[in-house]
Amino acid sequence: MVSVFRSEEMCLSQLFLQVEAAYCCVAELGELGLVQFKDLNMNVNSFQRKFVNEVRRCESLERILRFLEDEMQNEIVVQLLEKSPLTPLPREMITLETVLEKLEGELQEANQNQQALKQSFLELTELKYLLKKTQDFFETETNLADDFFTEDTSGLLELKAVPAYMTGKLGFIAGVINRERMASFERLLWRICRGNVYLKFSEMDAPLEDPVTKEEIQKNIFIIFYQGEQLRQKIKKICDGFRATVYPCPEPAVERREMLESVNVRLEDLITVITQTESHRQRLLQEAAANWHSWLIKVQKMKAVYHILNMCNIDVTQQCVIAEIWFPVADATRIKRALEQGMELSGSSMAPIMTTVQSKTAPPTFNRTNKFTAGFQNIVDAYGVGSYREINPAPYTIITFPFLFAVMFGDCGHGTVMLLAALWMILNERRLLSQKTDNEIWNTFFHGRYLILLMGIFSIYTGLIYNDCFSKSLNIFGSSWSVQPMFRNGTWNTHVMEESLYLQLDPAIPGVYFGNPYPFGIDPIWNLASNKLTFLNSYKMKMSVILGIVQMVFGVILSLFNHIYFRRTLNIILQFIPEMIFILCLFGYLVFMIIFKWCCFDVHVSQHAPSILIHFINMFLFNYSDSSNAPLYKHQQEVQSFFVVMALISVPWMLLIKPFILRASHRKSQLQASRIQEDATENIEGDSSSPSSRSGQRTSADTHGALDDHGEEFNFGDVFVHQAIHTIEYCLGCISNTASYLRLWALSLAHAQLSEVLWTMVMNSGLQTRGWGGIVGVFIIFAVFAVLTVAILLIMEGLSAFLHALRLHWVEFQNKFYVGDGYKFSPFSFKHILDGTAEE
């Protein structure tokens, strides 16, 4: 149970492993996930480390696996493993490399063959369409001249005047071009050839598949008639520039028909070959999909092990690997057992050796968590990772955080919706975890599902205390107020009811108030009262002050446990005690006055109740001559004066005494060190040849050096300034933090008012509509009301209350005892590496 409230006790050990057993031992520690390795090669470049070649081989295997994953994407479903395979031995890497490289080579060859076949299929398909279109065009060859003259082709307007032997020399080029380039192609062709060409094109009916990008492309078939070799060269250059594919097209119709038949035969053969190639490729992908996840885990584990081995020192002479590890003391037995398993797996005869190392380096902070407490621990760590072995605020945050959130968010209707959402995530967490989405917003909500669960439960509780459910009160037990006695004694009558705009119930009249308060929460009659806000504001404001001061005092008390654990007696006397005196004499007394007034002033004497605010102000001014504000109790002046004097005394108590005591202690240690040095010098002069004297000389010198080091670290000015900052921060912080807790009242008021406005402006208007239109309209209005409730009151207001609760815990609560300057324990864990949650 100790580890729940304080971080785990850690141990730094030096680990000696035989070279042959190092890999297996590190792998077993990775499976265990309880050891953090220190990098002993910080000054060595990553490319100069011992196992850099093995890491590169693993990265090469990862590249092959990424290639296989890309090939399988959207085609083959990878078979996930329920249980992670064990880390492969180093000799198994060669087998894995052979299998993956062979599979990669076969798949690349299949892809290249398939791409080449599809390219041939594309070209033959284009040629097929081209031959069909040119055949259709040449069938109208007899009317070609008429077509020329009907087109706006001024360069060939004199074609009828040209002799027959000249017209017979017209040449043509046929090809295929992308449809989006057709307009530019036609325009450039016209300008460069100055209109001395005849262009005719036709759109291909079906889209074609690009063999490289595998995207569908739309193409056009064109045929260009020209006269002369120069025009032919220009047209070919333009076609090359626009990446148009030019195909040979024979002039005789018989040859074109024969060529078309040949193309159709080749296409049929090509389709058969492509089908066989695709079947072979699918078989390769199926083989890869069956083992891909297992291969990936094995490669990642091997790579992680070699990364850890690169952080170790290797003693070539002794043939051993030296590592330094942090681990929890409570898990030492499990770690030794894992090392023994690694030794047995490797077949080594030398057992691993663990020796404890003393270090001045602060150990890492390790707080054990589960899926319930992890969210609360993350809230604490987001502010700062706790110092080693200091009090962990997370166990207290489990209760205080959702409670303070609920104080601001208190509405049992909204809390129920939040509770149902959290329960849905919790009940379906296995299915939702298996989806492994990258949506950060969803992951944030899902990882905080237990936090949302508690926030919903506490919101229902505070909502029942406020008697607030979607801005309406619940009359469960019946009101403790009655109107009839006001009429019986004649206070109210018909004339009063006609003349008065508001009527006020007088609890001093017998029977108006039954004397027994509402069994749980606030009486529902306050929801009808016009002075509801006045009553609730007073109640919530005082409640916020009480909760805030109680939490701050609790934080100061927790600092006592830190001082006791670290044996800081000086801090207990000179820091904790004056801090408690200051906060209790001032703000603890304020809580006492609030509760005292609640208990001692009932409805019969409430008219003469004094003002707590005026009493609290006069307390600091030592002003007790105000006769208009009666004292709360006897001897109030003496008690309050004593409290103020004690609070004033506690300030120099915190500020001055500790720095001077530390300076006196430092001077005393320096004086003792100088005396030891003098005695050692006299002994050396008496017998300089004695071995014991030389040993004493070394001991005294070491002691003096250590004290000198300590003396250099001590600086009275720094200590005094630090203590002054702490004192000022604490004294002013108590005042500002108490005021900061009033956000509990402000946020609760804002939430209640927004909820009431939403009900009045939206839902109430739908409920007041009568007739058939009202029946239909209420469904529409309820949908609008539900959407606005979720969007504004649950998400926006919920996020606002969440952030304010964070602020109250991080600043107002944790600064009383929590240092938070540690660093997180980051164990070498295969589970974290495979999940992608490993710390860098």
UniProtKB/Swiss-Prot annotation:
Topology with respect to the bilayer: Multi-pass membrane protein
One Pfam family here: V_ATPase_I
Side of membrane Cytoplasmic, spans: 1-390, 429-443, 559-576, 663-727, 813-840
An example Gene Ontology CC term for this record: synaptic vesicle membrane
Residues annotated as transmembrane: 391-409, 412-428, 444-473, 539-558, 577-597, 643-662, 728-752, 774-812
Residues in compartment: Vacuolar: 410-411, 474-538, 598-642, 753-773
Top-level taxon: Eukaryota
Result of altering residue 580 to T: In DRTA3; benign
GO biological process: intracellular pH reduction; ossification; proton transmembrane transport; regulation of pH; renal tubular secretion; sensory perception of sound; synaptic vesicle lumen acidification; vacuolar acidification
Keyword annotations of the record: Cell membrane, Disease variant, Hydrogen ion transport, Ion transport, Membrane, Transmembrane, Transmembrane helix, Transport
Tissue/organ expression: Expressed in adult and fetal kidney. Found in the inner ear.
GO molecular function: ATPase binding; proton-transporting ATPase activity, rotational mechanism
Compartments, record wording: Apical cell membrane; Basolateral cell membrane
Disordered: annotated segments: 675-704
Disease note: Renal tubular acidosis, distal, 3, with or without sensorineural hearing loss: An autosomal recessive disease characterized by reduced ability to acidify urine, variable hyperchloremic hypokalemic metabolic acidosis, nephrocalcinosis, and nephrolithiasis. It is due to functional failure of alpha-intercalated cells of the cortical collecting duct of the distal nephron, where vectorial proton transport is required for urinary acidification.
Chain's role: Subunit of the V0 complex of vacuolar(H+)-ATPase (V-ATPase), a multisubunit enzyme composed of a peripheral complex (V1) that hydrolyzes ATP and a membrane integral complex (V0) that translocates protons. V-ATPase is responsible for acidifying and maintaining the pH of intracellular compartments and in some cell types, is targeted to the plasma membrane, where it is responsible for acidifying the extracellular environment. Involved in normal vectorial acid transport into the urine by the kidney.
Assembly, per entry: V-ATPase is a heteromultimeric enzyme made up of two complexes: the ATP-hydrolytic V1 complex and the proton translocation V0 complex. The V1 complex consists of three catalytic AB heterodimers that form a heterohexamer, three peripheral stalks each consisting of EG heterodimers, one central rotor including subunits D and F, and the regulatory subunits C and H. The proton translocation complex V0 consists of the proton transport subunit a, a ring of proteolipid subunits c9c'', rotary subunit d, subunits e and f, and the accessory subunits ATP6AP1/Ac45 and ATP6AP2/PRR.
Family: Belongs to the V-ATPase 116 kDa subunit family.
Protein name: V-type proton ATPase 116 kDa subunit a 4
UniProt organism field: Homo sapiens
Gene responsible for this protein: ATP6V0A4
